[in-house]
Structure formats: C-alpha cells, structure tokens
Amino acid sequence: MPNGTKIDVSAFVSDYNEDFFGNDGIEKLQTWLNKNQDLCPIVEDAIRLGAPLARPSKIVCVGLNYAKHAAESGMDVPQEPVLFFKATSAIVGPFDNIIIPKGSTKTDWEVELAIVIGKTASYVSKENAINHIAGYVLHNDVSERAFQIERSGQWVKGKSCDTFAPLGPFIATKDEISDPNKLNLWLKLNGEI
C-alpha cells in the first residue's frame, strides 16, 4: 500500500506466476482491491516475505551492464551484451539468508533492477517491448566469482547456486515507475550501504 502497509491478497490470487501476469492479473487484482481492500488481513512486519513472484520459466541476466562493474571485474564493456541464465531454484525472498556454497572464496553481490515480463514474447520490436513489461523488482545478483570467472566455462556455476537470486520485497508496476533508468539503487550488507 502507498503508506507501507502490507496486505494479504491470497483471497484473490494464490501466487504471482506467469499465468497471473499473462492474463491481466495486475489489472484484475486492482479491480478486486477497489472492492475488497478493507477485508484483506494486514501482514505484520515480523512475517517472512517470500519472493514476490513464483518461479518464472527463466531468469535471463545481462552481464557487465555497468561500465564501473566491468572495470572492477577487470573486463571491458562488451560490444554485444553478455547474457546468462540463473536457475529459478536460486530465487528466495528479499530478506532470506544467502547460503554460501561449499568451497566458496569470493562470494559477491550486486543490486540490480529486474524486469518482470508479463506476456509471452519472442522477436519483439524495441518499440513494442514496453508492452510486455508487467513491472520491476529488486534483484540481488549474488555470485561466487571464483566459480564464475576463475574456473572458466559458463557463468551459471557461479551465478545459480541456491539462494543466489533474492527478489523483492514487491513488484512495482510499470505505471509506478515512469523511467527505470533514473532509479537510484543501493544494497545493504550487514546493515551498511
């Protein structure tokens, strides 16, 4: 809610998944809330929040998408985007603990803005891409850099460990964020920015 209050809408929807987003779920939920919001139980702050969407069919990520991060990694900004996948089993809630994998020596974290695609999409024009976006969600892109970079091969082995994709605490719909390029993102580690 705009005032920060969290409400339980499970009387309307059991999960935010591809079926929900693909069938105008956000619009239907808003219509339902207009009539039923006062009946929804309040979710207390002590309640654990899971990820704000169910496991999607895929998580596509863009690597080295910030010049500063590329420089920190000792890499050039690529001419062509570096794409990689994260396993959907990496998804956890926004405040869940991250499990450091056995043998990890260089676990790292990056705050990212994830785009939630709300419609099935293939070969979409740049001009029409915005019509497929359901919203935006914060994503902590956790990585084990030794697995990812020093052991060669695919990045997935350093990016897809269980708990390496905390999401949330909520999805902001595209009408709530007029220009995602102007957002100021930050991350806290052990209480420090």
Language model: regions and residue ranges:
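N-terminal non-catalytic cap/leader segment that marks the start of a structured domain
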Residues: 1-81, 175-178
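Glycine-enriched loop-and-adjacent helix/strand subsegments that border the catalytic/binding cleft
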Residues: 50, 56-193
